Amino acid sequence: MVGGGVIQQILRRKLHSQSLATPVLSWFSSKKAHEDAGSSGVRALALLGAGVTGLLSFSTVASADEAEHGLESPEYPWPHDGILSSYDHASIRRGHQVYQQVCASCHSMSLISYRDLVGVAYTEEEAKAMAAEIEVVDGPNDEGEMFTRPGKLSDRFPQPYANESAARFANGGAYPPDLSLITKARHNGPNYVFALLTGYRDPPAGISIREGLHYNPYFPGGAIAMPKMLNDEAVEYEDGVPATEAQMGKDIVSFLAWAAEPEMEERKLMGFKWIFLLSLALLQAAYYRRLKWSVLKSRKLVLDVVN
């Protein structure tokens, strides 16, 4: 009986200690769960903050890059961009008219002659009459003196200024670039030139432009010395096409693209001819390979030895 009573007391003490330990363990477990939830929330907030900071940093870098290098110009569907596409010659003629009446007073095209326009935008008689309107300093004559004469087809387009110093003095220190190769000299050339000519707008809030400059987001730095030159009805086209800002921009870009690559149509035609000839040669080689040489290659010789 004594032994049984002792055993019962030991069991009661063990059960009592387990009942006391259970709330303590549950308290520690709940505290750990709360700590895990809190640390997860802190990690989520940290990740969110890092993402927002990265996004803001990227936006700042992108804005700074656009301000330094200019806004990326959109892509436009130029008719001469296709593999077998050619220039719009009517647009080239109108673009030359825009260059003469709007651009030639400041920008030169020193690599283009009047004879280059023959068969592209004008007849030979029209080009001769156009060249005769300018005066060219030539010589020396038999007396050793220089003289002036009417222009000829072989003459280059006239220069608006005698030298670079005169050009900078007339344009407030800015030097108008030569336009002969402008669409090849600029990244994304035709799209950039069109976006630049039609992209003038008022500067946004917080941006100040120095006097004598004009805001254009497509120009590196955003400030350009050239004012907006393409305004509706700035020229009167010979063929009656409405001279809107976008139309004049398209035409002058077509003219400048031709000036930079006058051989493009001939190059594309020659490439197509070579591709056609090489395709015929490939078909002929495949024919001989399949029907001629395969027979010889698979031929077997049987040697019959007579005893």
Swiss-Prot record:
GO terms for cellular component: cytosol; mitochondrial inner membrane; mitochondrion; plant-type vacuole; vacuole. It is found in: Mitochondrion inner membrane. The chain crosses the membrane at residues 271-288. The keyword Chaperone does not apply. It comes from the Eukaryota. Heme c binds at residues 103, 106-107, 226. It holds the Pfam family Cytochrom_C1. Residues 289-307 are mitochondrial matrix. GO terms for molecular function: electron transfer activity; heme binding; metal ion binding. It is a single-pass membrane protein. Residues 1-64 form a transit peptide. Keywords: Electron transport, Heme, Iron, Membrane, Metal-binding, Mitochondrion, Mitochondrion inner membrane, Respiratory chain, Transit peptide, Transmembrane, Transmembrane helix, Transport. InterPro entries: Cyt_c-like_dom, Cyt_c-like_dom_sf, Cyt_c1, Cyt_c1_TM_anchor_C. Binds 1 heme c group covalently per subunit. Component of the ubiquinol-cytochrome c oxidoreductase, a multisubunit transmembrane complex that is part of the mitochondrial electron transport chain which drives oxidative phosphorylation. Belongs to the cytochrome c family. This is Cytochrome c1 1, heme protein, mitochondrial. The lineage of its organism: Eukaryota, Viridiplantae, Streptophyta, Embryophyta, Tracheophyta. The gene is CYC1-1.
